[in-house]
From Swiss-Prot:
Gene3D superfamilies: Amidase signature (AS) domain (3.90.1300.10). Coiled coil: none annotated. It comes from Chloroflexus aggregans (strain MD-66 / DSM 9485). Belongs to the amidase family. GatA subfamily. This is Glutamyl-tRNA(Gln) amidotransferase subunit A. It is an enzyme of class 6 (ligase). Keywords: ATP-binding, Ligase, Nucleotide-binding, Protein biosynthesis. Allows the formation of correctly charged Gln-tRNA(Gln) through the transamidation of misacylated Glu-tRNA(Gln) in organisms which lack glutaminyl-tRNA synthetase. The reaction takes place in the presence of glutamine and ATP through an activated gamma-phospho-Glu-tRNA(Gln). PROSITE patterns: AMIDASES. Signal peptide: none annotated. PANTHER family: GLUTAMYL-TRNA(GLN) AMIDOTRANSFERASE SUBUNIT A, TRANSAMIDASE.
Length: 488
């Protein structure tokens, strides 16, 4: 058997069901791995070992009685620290939420607990999910397990690094402009951004309310399908949740992609893309052709406007969402002679520089004199971007593109150059603006660092993406590669 800490979710489920492994043994292996690697990786902000072991013991007892709740029963999982967990610190990577313990669970947490998963802790992220490197956390900088001098991506960098380092078999992340997919690619794991509305956002600390989506991160597409079977589905507590039936995602993994038409959008192979990244991506796309898919070159002409459009809409939504954090009822509170001075000092000291930058940008875009020139126009361009996807999906079943124009970059290289950092998400932002689903699978290496292939689907057609990603993983072994932390 593979080292316990590097088991996939699917392999762990098989071993648990066969009685070859107990949930307690698996949880103890994960906790030991976290203790051994956390000084290098710094993925976790808060651990819950006692609760995790208690949940694992309960899972073992259910399995002994033949009453396992789901294939995830007894599987440890980590949670990005923007998702509310009852009684467990939830900071969104921000000083302003220091010490905050939510009085309720997010819907995705309720569903994971009902399925018997073992919640092992909360994972580091860029503050309020604003960033592409996890350097914006108020608490620590997470490193990439393939090279600890480099970033893991962001904003779900802790979620990606924890899987890649073998700390947990799977995690939840969130994706507002690429925050599941880019770190998955940079850390050599698989990650899915579901369609907007497919997974409940109730209990998610919002960054951009029309863009955010919760999704799974793990080694394999089969693992993602198992998690989606638990977390997907309508939630009446979330007004943005789609009242649609959800398929059995594992049943979609047939291995057969013959006859599918895959579009290759020319705009995604951007100027400045590293040659090794483009080569690995094109090689992966060729594998799909060899498996029976038809490749079609297509165009998404408004892609070039996605970056400025996103950086008007997302900060505008952040400006509104983050207005609620004032230190009056919970979290960090600064001193002040008056209530208004206290609030001003709390927000000035509690928010980090990138969050303050985006709040100011969003407030400016929403101001009376500039609303039409910026925010309204950005929403109009967003409609054109969405229309591009609608039209291209009349011709093809899905799209295949690079995920990031580069491999993981050195820590500190871009943190003082916001535009360079924003360009890291040039291949992922349009998908959030359009609200469609996208999957990332590892597809090779460039200069010894992982590269990810991005597959983009029709709205609510995650099943086809998972089918194609799983078929790709059946004939390649990139998802089986593991970093050597002794050399990282």
């Amino acid at each position: 058997m593979t080292e316990l800490h590097y088991l996939t979710v699917s392999a762990a489920h098989t071993a648990l069901a066969a009685g070859e492994l107990t949930a307690v043994e698996l949880t103890e292996a994960c906790l030991a791995r976290i203790n051994a690697t956390e000084p290098q990786i710094r993925a976790f902000l808060h651990l819950t070992p006692e609760a995790a072991l208690a949940a694992a013991r309960a899972a073992d007892e259910r399995r002994r009685r033949g009453q396992a709740l789901s294939p995830l029963d007894g599987i440890p999982i980590g949670i990005k620290d923007v998702i509310c967990t009852n009684g467990v610190p939830t900071t969104a990577g921000s000083r302003i939420l220091a010490g905050f313990r939510p009085p309720y669970n997010a819907t995705v947490i309720e569903r994971l607990l009902a399925a018997g998963t073992v919640l092992i802790g909360k994972l580091n992220c860029d503050e309020f999910a604003m960033g592409s490197s996890t350097e914006n956390s108020a608490y620590q900088i997470t490193t990439n397990p393939w090279d600890t001098s480099r970033v893991p991506g962001g904003s779900s960098g802790g979620s990606a690094a924890a899987v890649a380092a073998g700390q947990v078999p799977a995690t939840l992340g969130t994706d507002t402009g690429g925050s599941i997919r880019q770190p998955a690619a940079l850390c050599g794991i698989s990650g899915l951004k579901p369609t907007y509305g497919r997974v409940s956002r109730y209990g998610l600390i919002a960054y951009g309310s029309s863009l955010d989506q919760i999704g799974p991160m793990a080694w394999t597409v089969a693992d993602l399908a198992l998690i989606m079977n638990v977390i997907a589905g309508h939630d009446p507590r979330d007004g943005t949740s789609a009242p649609l039936p959800t398929p059995d995602y594992t049943a979609a993994l047939t291995g057969d992609i013959r006859g599918l038409r895959i579009g290759i959008p020319r705009e995604y192979f951007v100027e400045g893309m590293e040659p090794g990244v483009e080569a690995a991506t094109r090689t992966a796309i060729e594998v799909l052709r060899e498996q029976g898919a038809t490749l079609v070159e297509v165009s998404l002409p408004h892609t070039k406007y996605a970056l400025p459009t996103y950086y008007i809409i997302a900060p505008a939504e952040a400006s509104a969402n983050l207005a609620r954090f004032d230190g009056v009822r919970y979290g960090f509170r600064a001193e002040g002679e008056t209530m208004w001075e206290q609030i001003e000092q709390t927000r000035g000291q509690g928010f980090g520089p990138e969050v303050r930058r985006r709040i100011m940008l969003g407030t400016y875009a929403l101001s009376a004199g500039y609303y039409d020139a910026y925010y309204r126009r950005a929403q109009q361009v967003r409609t054109l971007i969405k229309r591009d996807f609608d039209q291209v999906f009349n011709e093809v079943d899905l799209l295949a593109t690079p995920t990031s124009p580069t491999v993981a970059f050195p820590i500190g290289q871009k943190i003082n150059d916001p535009l360079a950092m924003y360009l890291s998400d040039v291949c992922t932002l349009p998908i959030n603006l359009a609200g469609v689903p996208a999957l990332v699978v590892p597809c090779g290496f460039s200069d010894g660092l992982p590269v990810g292939l991005q597959l983009i689907g029709r709205p609510f057609d995650e099943a086809t993406l998972l089918r194609v990603g799983d078929a790709y993983q059946r004939v390649t072994d990139w998802h089986t590669r593991r970093p050597d932390l002794a050399r990282a």
